[in-house]
């Protein structure tokens, strides 16, 4: 899944982007050098004493898939450790939402036990909403909520969408609203704002493709 965000949209979320710059360091300090290199991958959108919001880069894992992986969680932990915000605490920051590896977008992290628990509750109870911007093939003229059932094949990690419930399938709901429409090389495209009412693997791409509007790059 690819997430396409305009500069204007990003600016609305973050005000002025803060990109973490590595401070001057002693060249003989290999550990600090490694940490500073990791810091450069963090684009901080918002930060206070309790919360950190970053714009995850494409290609970066939200969380480890394997023990040897370096994910956004490790980058955030290193960033806070270098600023002595977590050195005297057994608590390590955690993220409250995840994005696919190739998806760019905002991820929220709690810097304290209390803030992490509070933010997780907001996400779980849908008091805090996540929206995705994506470009799809074809013209979509009006906003709509679509319903269906998602069937996942675990071995191949592929999903199919059906209108009726089958054994092993789960119900999905996807709401979308068209924001812009245009043409490119005689093809029609629509920029959508998507709200995952249910959040399942590959839901956006599979559900939109099932109604004849695949994400660009998927057709």
Question: Which residues fall in each region the model found?
Answer:
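RNA pseudouridine synthases
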Residues: 1-219
């Amino acid at each position: 899944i690819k997430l396409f965000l305009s500069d204007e949209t990003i600016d609305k979320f973050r005000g002025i982007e803060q990109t973490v710059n590595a401070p001057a360091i002693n060249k003989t300090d290999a550990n600090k050098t490694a940490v500073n290199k990791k810091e450069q991958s963090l684009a901080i959108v918002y930060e206070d004493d309790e919360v950190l919001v970053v714009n995850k880069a494409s290609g970066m894992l939200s969380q480890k898939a394997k023990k040897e992986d370096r994910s956004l969680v490790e980058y955030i932990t290193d960033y806070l450790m270098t600023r002595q915000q977590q050195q005297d605490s057994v608590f390590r920051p955690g993220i409250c939402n995840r994005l696919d590896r190739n998806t760019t977008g905002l991820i929220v992290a709690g810097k304290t036990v209390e803030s992490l628990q509070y933010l997780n509750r907001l996400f779980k109870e849908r008091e805090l909403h996540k929206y995705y911007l994506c470009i799809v093939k074809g013209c979509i003229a009006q906003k709509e909520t679509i319903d269906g059932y998602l069937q996942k094949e675990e071995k191949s990690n592929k999903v199919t969408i059906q209108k009726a419930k089958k054994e092993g399938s789960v119900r999905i709901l996807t709401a979308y609203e068209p924001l812009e429409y245009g043409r490119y090389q005689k093809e029609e495209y629509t920029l959508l704002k998507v709200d995952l009412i249910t959040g399942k693997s590959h839901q956006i791409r599979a559900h939109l493709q099932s109604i004849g509007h695949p994400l660009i790059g998927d057709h």
